[in-house]
A protein has these predicted regions:
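Eukaryotic scaffold/interaction segments
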Residues: 1-147
Length: 147
């Protein structure tokens, strides 16, 4: 059963990361979708598997699937993560409202949890530094503390 679960996870994550419609319109949504999928999978594992050993085996399959899928094109995954964080760390020009500090911390923690699996950390750093400097120079940063 674990093998089928692992296969399903890999296929579903690969589909999320290669969805042409999402990639063409809003690439940052790819990471949002991956984070939602990860959360839903973790909740499912917690509800279904009450024994620690089973729970741990299926969580391991999820981690392996994330690592495999995010590194199929790790440069692209790292870029999308930087764009996703940039979107949340900017002031919203349309509504002029900021995300609450708690929401922002949750987003950052979620991205960090997935970032561990990406091998191209240097690519992420490059894109993040570029967007950080742009936010700071244009004074579009939502909060200095989060930066």
């Amino acid at each position: 059963m674990r093998k089928e679960w692992a296969t399903y996870l890999k296929l579903a994550l690969e589909k999320l990361l290669t969805d042409e419609a999402t990639l063409a319109k809003m690439s940052f949504r790819v990471i949002e979708n991956v984070l939602k999928f990860k959360k839903q999978s973790e909740e499912l594992i917690s509800r279904v598997f009450l024994e620690k050993e089973d729970h741990d085996n299926f969580k391991l399959a999820l981690r392996e699937a994330l690592e495999h899928s995010l590194n199929l094109n790790s440069n692209q995954s790292a870029e999308f993560m930087a764009k996703y964080l940039d979107m949340h760390l900017k002031k919203s020009p349309a509504s002029n409202s900021l995300e609450s500090e708690q929401d922002l911390r949750v987003v950052i923690a979620d991205v960090i949890n997935v970032f561990r699996y990406v091998k191209s950390k240097d690519v992420f750093e490059e894109f993040y530094a570029r967007s950080l400097s742009r936010r700071l120079l244009l004074k579009k940063s939502a909060t200095r503390e989060a930066e």
